[in-house]
Amino acid sequence: MGSQGYLPDPQPPNLGGYLHTTYFGPISWYRQLLSADSWAIDEGEPYVKQTTRNHCLIATVSGVQKLTVPVEKSRSEERGARNGFSGSEPLLTRDVRISEHGKWRTEHWNALCTAYGESPFFDYYADDLRPFFERRDWELLIDYNMAIMQKMLELIAPSHLPQLGEAANGLFSCGRTIKNAPLSSGRGVGGEASYWQVYQRQNGFLPDLSILDLLCCMGPEAILYLRN
């Protein structure tokens, strides 16, 4: 994937601004994504650890569980670790590599099967989701997340795909579209109405979980919730 990003037309229609990439991002992120004709997924931003860039939140019988994709240390961090100081060169999101140490893919898939196996639509979407936890086709986190985003939109809002499937998969470098476009985390977008959740009796309603929660619980009606 090119490091220069995609340079869109000078005045793309209804550009919503910039969003950071997410791993099965929160519901509010997808609601915001669907609120404009197009968004810029910022691949040139400094990578921020411990965010939805590499983790998602799902519901379990015990409450919220975080699933984290491990990433490799940057060369700067490795040099700093060897020499006893912190790396000074910022790691850009487009350069973050997925770590294949451990069995995190299997652990994530097993967690999803346990959490949503009894949900109305998990079995219906399982074949679409499973490849992201079995295949190792993606070395870069940004590529992995973009493939996930495309699949989520294909399942939830296929009519939105043409805008996001254009050149370079909609990846833009910060500052290359419209001046003063806001940079958004994709969180905190308005109030969130409740919907039925698998463990609502035990936990009450858990807001703004991963898009996977909405997909498994509401299926084809997920788009109605996101558009509401």
Please annotate each region the language model reported:
Residues 2-228:
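Residues lining hydrophobic/aromatic ligand-binding pockets adjacent to catalytic sites
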